[in-house]
Amino acid sequence: MSHLVLKPGTLTLSQIRDISRNKLTLELADEAIADINISSGIVQKIIDEGRTVYGINTGFGLLANTKIEDKDLQLLQRSIVLSHAAGTGQYMQDATVRLMMVLKINSLSRGFSGIRLEVINFLIQLVNAEVYPCVPEKGSVGASGDLAPLSHMSLTLLGEGEVSYKGQIMSAKEGLEIAGLEPIELAAKEGLALLNGTQASTALALEGLFNAEDLFAASSVIGAMSVEAAMGSRSPFDPRIHAARGQKGQMDAAGLFRHLLGDESEISLSHVDCEKVQDPYSLRCQPQVLGACLTQIRQAAEVLGTEANGVTDNPLVFQDTGDIISGGNFHAEPVAMAADNLAIALAELGAIAERRIALLIDPNLSKLPPFLVENGGVNSGFMIAQVTAAALASENKTYAHPASVDSLPTSANQEDHVSMATFAARRLRDMSENTRGVLAIELLAAAQGLDFRAPLQPSAAVAKAKAELREVVTYYDKDRFFGPDIEASTDLLLTSSFNSYLPAGILASF
């Protein structure tokens, strides 16, 4: 288990990837404490002076002009958490909630939120104790922030709701006992600061980003395997072609294929003088398609890395002047659009992979046995595996419809344009599973095709990837229960082992 000393606003994507996939212990860097204390002191000064400021001693949304008396300020903060915890659906995975909590801690600790150190330390202790609030997946429109999910997270501080501890669901009070904590009373602005922000949608989108990066790496390796299995040409990866166009993602993708395929192999040398003039697009245009996907993944990484370190609650406290200013950083449009772009990339990675599977099983295109099996007719081979891949790729095309173009007014039209970022990000998990399934089938098909090319050998990287698969799935010599093969291939992809095949600097988080 790793230990992170959090310097607010400085999380790297590599660190965030680790937080999203592994448990950790957390502590605040000493230099953050002064900013937190100054910020919360400004809020207390406003109350002491009897000034009226939105978010501190007013109502919310359409009720923003309603002044709240000092005696009701703690009740106001408790009430907003309870009333806004209106999510529905299955609970988020513990890993998602852990990342959401760390992102919220990171944001609150920047010193713009007017929240006490005691509250931030409470969240840190929950993370360290592995006590994660139970947060329903559905119920946020991504403005004003992820209100429902973050309210469910905040319930735990009040001793309300449920938590998850080592896979067991229990009451928040039981979870607090395990963490050695007592419920706390929230002071002015603290409830609003906790539940206002984009941390739920950002956590989900970051998980989608890391999956997309893994699947891009896998798609590159498996795509190179298919080039060798189908006896494809290396000339489409010539750097001069891609330099002439000038698209960086495409140039980098082409370079990656040159890295994986090398200058030549026994297989490539065997068909130098073949009669085939050009390969189908699913082989030949991989740099163009994967390069475009790479560009979208990189842009999403930049946006989400910034958002993970940003302050997205409202209003914000500015220490240099003592001003408290209302704005709209809670609007998650950047997250929604980044997630939409990731969705398009995930759909395309799966779509072109499915076409390569179709190519490999078609003897007219691949010059391999029909459906990649001996004694065809008696054996059906990869016939229905390709149908499964087609079903998964097709499902992703529907998922890829942009969520950010939708909006429904809420809060009596005060919040009249919203981002739908949480759904935009949440569907990335299903899309990643689908694309992973398509690539798992292509990995099986490409390895099978390479076995038919024996004794000719592919490039070293392709041979290594095939050997990894053959450790868990044997050659398909005759029909057998196909499901376990797909499952084993999928499990191999889940290890992210193909990430190590990529040169440094291709992707942002590793």
From Swiss-Prot:
GO terms for molecular function: histidine ammonia-lyase activity. InterPro entries: Aromatic_Lyase, Fumarase/histidase_N, HutH, L-Aspartase-like, Phe/His_NH3-lyase_AS. It catalyses: L-histidine = trans-urocanate + NH4(+). Contains an active site 4-methylidene-imidazol-5-one (MIO), which is formed autocatalytically by cyclization and dehydration of residues Ala-Ser-Gly. One of its GO terms (biological process) is L-histidine catabolic process to glutamate and formamide. Gene3D superfamilies: Fumarase/aspartase (Central domain) (1.20.200.10), Fumarase/aspartase (N-terminal domain) (1.10.275.10). Pathway: Amino-acid degradation; L-histidine degradation into L-glutamate; N-formimidoyl-L-glutamate from L-histidine: step 1/3. It comes from Shewanella woodyi (strain ATCC 51908 / MS32). This is Histidine ammonia-lyase. HAMAP family: His_ammonia_lyase (MF_00229). Coiled coil: none annotated. CDD domains: PAL-HAL. The modification 2,3-didehydroalanine (Ser) is found at S144. There is a cross-link at A143-G145 (5-imidazolinone (Ala-Gly)). It is an enzyme of class 4 (lyase).
